[in-house]
Amino acid sequence: MTRLRWAWLLGLLAISLVAAWLLWVRPEKIDMAIYAPATSLLYLESNRPLAVVDTIVGTDAWRIVDKATGTQPVAQPKGWLQSFIGWTGIGPIESVILARAQLAVVVTDLGTTEDGETLRVKPEGAVLIETHTTESRIRPPVEEALKKLAEITYGKPTARRTTIDGVEFIEWIAPEGSRQIVATIVGSLVIVGNSEQAVRSCLAVSLRRSSSLKEDPGLERMRLQLAGDRALTFGYVPSANSPHLLSVGVPLVMGRAPGDSEFQRLVTTNAAKVFGSLGWSSHPFRNGVEDRYLISLQPAVIARLKPNFARARTITEIQRRWPDHVHSVTYYRFEDPAAVWQDLKAAASSQVDVLSAVVFSSLLKSALLSYGIDEPEAFLSAVKGELLTLRLDQNGERTMIIAGVRNQESLREIVKKRLGPNSRSDRVGDAEIREDSKGEWAVSLSKDVVVLGSPLDVRRYSEGAGVNSTMMKDDDLRKITFFSPFSSSANIVTYTDDSDRITVFISAILAAKGTQSLASGPIEALIAELPYSATETTLGERGFERVTKSPLGQFSTLFPLLIPEKPGLTKSNLQSE
């Protein structure tokens, strides 16, 4: 009996020790923002990197990668095995790091460099990797992985080790000397950046010498709003820095150099009076990815926009009357489009000075110039219900706009003024087609629909519409509306052909693997079968809410930026040798 008791006691003791050890070695998730500088322009995090990989590998787009390389899909490790490795730290060190890692990316500065006559934006930033594993264990494999990355990226880089304030830095410098990878390891944290300054900024925060982004009260609010704690990835731009990003982005949109300090100051000063923080999160959705965005607006701006930001109650037949192929199409569904236009101008103008109001009005007006509309207020007052803008090719050189007719006579006067006195006209069915003397623009006007675009596109559209009310095949419509139906309740819905982004993504993956596509024809055909992305935009309580559902989400844009692309594996070279 005594022996049995001792056996029970020893057994309980062993179980208690194992349980205590498991509790002790189990890593606790942390808020990665604690490592990000409070002054960060942009912050991205992924607390479940393996879930991101599983989601991407499970998409229909990734199956094309397997077909392109002729490889069979690789079975992913079982969830219980990943959990065991992550919990205990038992296993190959590479697997332990992957199972335990939390990632964050910070952009600390937006610099500009001149490339001939082109001014390029060159962000400075760093990747933060919390491995939840001791430095002595992670240092060798991390340094080896970074060395391979530098060799893939730069060819024959120069390696250099330096010590600053007692912390070792490792640099791999490209042969031309203008690019570099800088890294340091502090405890379980790995910091990798494209400049020493970016790495040192993050290091200072991790050593508690500088304040962190975690102290920003808007960060947690944005996480809650976008379900960031359950997301594959989460991104945040502090309200204090969103104007700075706009000061770089707006000049590029307007065709001005970001180096124009006076214009940037104008945008920065006034953007803060309109915009707040920005947020993004990504989630799995129907063998694809859903990206959610929140563009915060100041309360006064939201209050001004709300009354007229109402969706049109009726859906007209123009929703199905598209050309036989479009690169992208955007629906604007408002009861009164002209009132919404006026509200946009008034809401922004009421928050800024006179000069900035003029600049904003010019920027807003230019949005419709590419469609041949130079009097937005008059045009929008003469149309009703749904309004469609279409880009027939990726570069936007061929564009169209289609709208329902509210006032046919007003539209006729606008058309005559826009096309000039020497315009030519004829009729196709019940539509009058007018074309300018240079053959650059044409307008088709009937009692129900007005169409603006190039003469060839407008005529082709009008002739097709006269025969059938539905111009696209049902299979094409299903592909376009796969992620979002025409009946979406959003005010603005955009459908976009993602083929080019996916092709670039696949090229980057092939480059990383060091392989080439087996054949271009079948691969391009498979990419063409993927559904269009769909973006729904509404005005919520905090600002503009955008939800994009697509084959790969923003990962198709972000991954090619991280993976160096080798010569011969570009979009035009997805082919066999």
List the model feature ranges, each with a label.
Residues W6-E171, R221-F275, E290-N395, V415-G420, ...:
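Structural boundary/hinge residues at secondary-structure and domain interfaces
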Residues N47-P49, H132-T134, G187-L189, S195-Q197, ...:
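Solvent-exposed coil/turn segments that connect beta secondary-structure elements
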Residues T133, T184-V190, G288, G396, ...:
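Short, solvent-exposed coil/turn segments at beta-strand boundaries
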Residues T163-S178, G429-K438:
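Short, Gly/Ser/Thr-enriched beta-strand-loop segments that form substrate-interacting elements
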Residues R179-P251, S437-A519:
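A conserved glycine-rich beta-strand in the N-terminal activation segment of trypsin-fold
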